[in-house]
């Protein structure tokens, strides 16, 4: 279910402050470390790199135009697929 249009997109305030500091030139342009997977990607984020936490480690995500409107967590998978169990009788 989509978010209501009257509410608008969501992004954490601390994340927006970090992005604004980089845009204004007050902070060095390095990956922005964040745990906020729920934040929506805004057009201001294009060209920046975010280090998004997946529960175990930080995965670097470079934001492009196609990612605008999606959430940061969509580009940092939390689960690893190790394959289905192999049938031992078929191997012989």
Swiss-Prot record:
GO terms for biological process: ribosomal small subunit assembly; translation. Disulfide bonds: none annotated. InterPro entries: Ribosomal_uS19, Ribosomal_uS19_bac-type, Ribosomal_uS19_CS, Ribosomal_uS19_SF. GO terms for cellular component: cytoplasm; small ribosomal subunit. Keywords: Ribonucleoprotein, Ribosomal protein, RNA-binding, rRNA-binding. One of its GO terms (molecular function) is rRNA binding. HAMAP family: Ribosomal_uS19. Protein S19 forms a complex with S13 that binds strongly to the 16S ribosomal RNA. Belongs to the universal ribosomal protein uS19 family. This is Small ribosomal subunit protein uS19. The lineage of its organism: Bacteria, Bacillati, Mycoplasmatota, Mycoplasmoidales, Metamycoplasmataceae. The gene is rpsS.
